[in-house]
Amino acid sequence: YKSTPAFGFDRLVATLVSNEYELDGVPGFYTKKNNTYGINFNKKTTGILIPICSITDKIEGFQIRLDKAFDDRKYIWFSSSNHFRGTSVGGPAHFIGNPLSKTVYVTEGALKANIAHVLSGKTFIAVPGVSHYKSLESIFTQLKQTGTTDIVEAYDMDKYTNIHVEKACMNMICLANNFGFNVHRLKWNDKYKGIDDWLYSMNNK
């Protein structure tokens, strides 16, 4: 992963432009008053860039894991929707693993999915937030075409104590059922909140 810059934004944009990269319509970039490009980085957005990848391994956007959370948020999108001629990232789901896998796990958060994939070798989809189950529709459509048969719900263990997370789980399960997948629910020792934490503990026994 790469860190976001804390300064040198104009120089970074100038380098991209001089290398003839097209920045129109790219989330995170916008047009400034002097008709040059700007990039939506600032001192509050310092952190780690986490690529959000499609089932074909193309980057569709970035999340930033913030060094210092603000407004109770640890993650934000690299987006420029609130700037002139800026673009929203749209909140896509993240995919990592083999697109031909018969079984695919669904969790929340790209970084968590990446860690779980490395620790288990399994294929994962990550929604950007538990309530964003509709972001799965495109990937589910593609997985159905490539032969996936089973979806495993692997949301955090607070799904058993948080009614909002449980509702989000059920929405995802209903969506997977509508696509004709066999759906399973994964449960582990609840002292480990996320599947990444649980897999890490299992790998270190």
Language model feature labels by segment:
Residues G8, L12-L16, I195, K205:
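Generic structural signal of hydrophobic/aromatic residues within well-ordered alpha-helices
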Residues S101-V104, L111-K205:
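TOPRIM fold recognition
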Residues F7-G8, Y21, A154:
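N-terminal structured subdomain of primase-like DNA metabolism proteins
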Residues R11-G147:
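Phosphate-handling DNA/RNA-contact segment within nucleic-acid enzymes
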Residues K2-P5:
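Extended, non-catalytic subsegments within catalytic or DNA/protein-binding/adaptor domains
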